């Protein structure tokens, strides 16, 4: 049987993920300084380095046994995986934001049930947010530079992730509402959890010292 295979996200929570795995005694430090290499073997463990949005895909379909990913990705994709531990790192917020000079106008439009255009990288999250309020929105999916959309007239507002709010402030965007909060989570493939129960439970016990158990 191959070694335990772990999917690690590139980007903002990459270092947090490595620290959590290293704290669990895994040789995750081997992933540092390896440039574009996306598959690693070290100490009997296999690591996949992928885009955050792809981590749940690898885990759900069994290409990885476990993975680390932000709660925002899980809420957007709703994958069929086990969510084991809230690692508490990589904290950020999903927010509704609009240009500062038009913020009150957008708030009034939403309050009066007018259809607003919303740009986002999280279309399911955005639709769910407006549906739960009983409001309608035209959701425009983008894959980057969401902050630009209301500045050039593509949308009235955005739904996006922010950690410090710096990018929003730099683009004169004001937060209208906080939709949810996100931290890094340890997830597992359901089949792997049964077949590799001892390995995954051992990992869970180690990383769980720094995190909070959640439902699967």
Curated annotation (Swiss-Prot):
Keywords assigned? Amino-acid biosynthesis, ATP-binding, Cytoplasm, Glycosyltransferase, Histidine biosynthesis, Nucleotide-binding, Transferase
Task: List GO molecular-function terms, semicolon-separated.
Answer: ATP binding; ATP phosphoribosyltransferase activity
A Gene Ontology biological process term = L-histidine biosynthetic process
Pfam short name (any one): HisG
Q: Which Gene3D superfamilies match?
A: Periplasmic binding protein-like II
Enzyme Commission designation: 2.4.2.17
Which pathway does the record list?
Amino-acid biosynthesis; L-histidine biosynthesis; L-histidine from 5-phospho-alpha-D-ribose 1-diphosphate: step 1/9
- TM helices/strands, residue ranges: none
**Membership in a protein family:** Belongs to the ATP phosphoribosyltransferase family. Short subfamily.
As for what it does, the entry says: Catalyzes the condensation of ATP and 5-phosphoribose 1-diphosphate to form N'-(5'-phosphoribosyl)-ATP (PR-ATP). Has a crucial role in the pathway because the rate of histidine biosynthesis seems to be controlled primarily by regulation of HisG enzymatic activity.
Record remark on domains: Lacks the C-terminal regulatory region which is replaced by HisZ.
Q: What is this protein called?
A: ATP phosphoribosyltransferase
Traced from the root, the source organism's taxonomic lineage reads: Bacteria, Bacillati, Actinomycetota, Rubrobacteria, Rubrobacterales
């Amino acid at each position: 049987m191959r070694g335990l295979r772990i999917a690690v996200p590139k980007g903002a929570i990459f270092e947090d993920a490595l620290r959590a795995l290293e704290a669990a005694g895994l040789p995750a430090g081997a992933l540092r300084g390896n440039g574009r290499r996306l598959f690693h073997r070290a100490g009997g463990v296999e690591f996949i380095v992928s885009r955050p949005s792809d981590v749940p895909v690898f885990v759900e379909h069994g290409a990885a046994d476990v993975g680390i990913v932000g709660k925002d990705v899980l809420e957007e994709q709703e994958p069929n995986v086990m969510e084991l531990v809230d690692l508490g790192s990589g904290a950020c917020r999903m927010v509704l934001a609009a240009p500062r000079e038009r913020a009150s106008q957008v708030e009034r439009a939403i309050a009066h049930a007018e259809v607003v255009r919303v740009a986002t990288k999280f279309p399911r999250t955005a639709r769910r947010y407006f549906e739960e309020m009983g409001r309608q929105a035209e959701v425009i999916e983008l894959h980057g530079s969401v902050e630009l959309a209301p500045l050039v007239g593509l949308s009235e507002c955005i739904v996006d992730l922010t950690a410090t709010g710096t990018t929003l402030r730099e683009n004169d965007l004001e937060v209208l509402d906080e939709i949810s909060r996100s931290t890094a989570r340890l997830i597992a493939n359901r089949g792997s959890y049964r077949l590799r129960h001892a390995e995954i439970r051992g990992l869970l016990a180690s990383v769980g010292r720094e995190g909070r158990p959640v439902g699967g």
